[in-house]
Curated annotation (Swiss-Prot):
Localisation: Cell inner membrane
Official protein name in the record: NADH-quinone oxidoreductase subunit I
Assembly description: NDH-1 is composed of 14 different subunits. Subunits NuoA, H, J, K, L, M, N constitute the membrane sector of the complex.
Cofactor(s) named in the record: [4Fe-4S] cluster
Single GO MF descriptor: NADH:ubiquinone reductase (non-electrogenic) activity
Length: 162
């Protein structure tokens, strides 16, 4: 055993350096959040709870093209289109999403030509029963109305990358 190794073991240099390292981090601000009361920042591309959007005049955006239903890999979306209106457009009669099947891939949002179906910023939608995770058109439109300000802001921030 050489002299330097003996000196290091007697003087406990590793212990002292580790102690000073721990003290340096001990006095820094804590990086944790008090979660239910404080929330961290969310990316504009965050994929949370689904929502159906409306136009500013209150009309729903969905034109019943069924692209989101076709592209969904989990087959979680079910759409029934109503008859054509006088102006030639269609609207949905039934728009259901089975959130139990959904894998939050965002393909429905990418496929939609009118930005009708989006995945909003809400990530707190735990339920007590499984049936509450079957979203119908009314629930999706209510989500869209509730989160419209945040959704439109996120879409505007993401626009340069589309």
């Amino acid at each position: 055993m050489n002299i330097s190794a003996t000196a290091r073991s007697l003087l406990l240099s590793e212990f002292v350096s580790a102690f000073f390292l721990a003290m340096r981090y001990f006095f820094q601000p804590k990086p944790t959040l008090n979660y239910p009361f404080e929330k961290g920042p969310i990316s504009p591309r965050f994929r949370g709870e689904h929502a159906l959007r409306r136009y500013p005049n209150g009309e729903e955006r969905c034109i019943a093209c069924k692209l989101c239903e076709a592209v969904c890999p989990a087959q979680a979306i079910t759409i029934e289109a109503g008859p054509r209106r006088n102006d030639g457009t269609r609207r949905t009669v039934r728009y259901d999403i089975d959130m139990v099947k959904c894998i939050y891939c965002g393909l429905c949002q990418e496929a939609c030509p009118v930005d009708a179906i989006v995945e909003g910023p809400n990530f707190e939608f735990a339920t007590e029963t499984r049936e509450e995770l079957y979203y119908d058109k009314a629930k999706l439109l209510a989500n869209g109305d509730r989160w419209e300000r945040e959704i439109s802001k996120a879409i505007a921030l993401d626009a340069p990358y589309r």
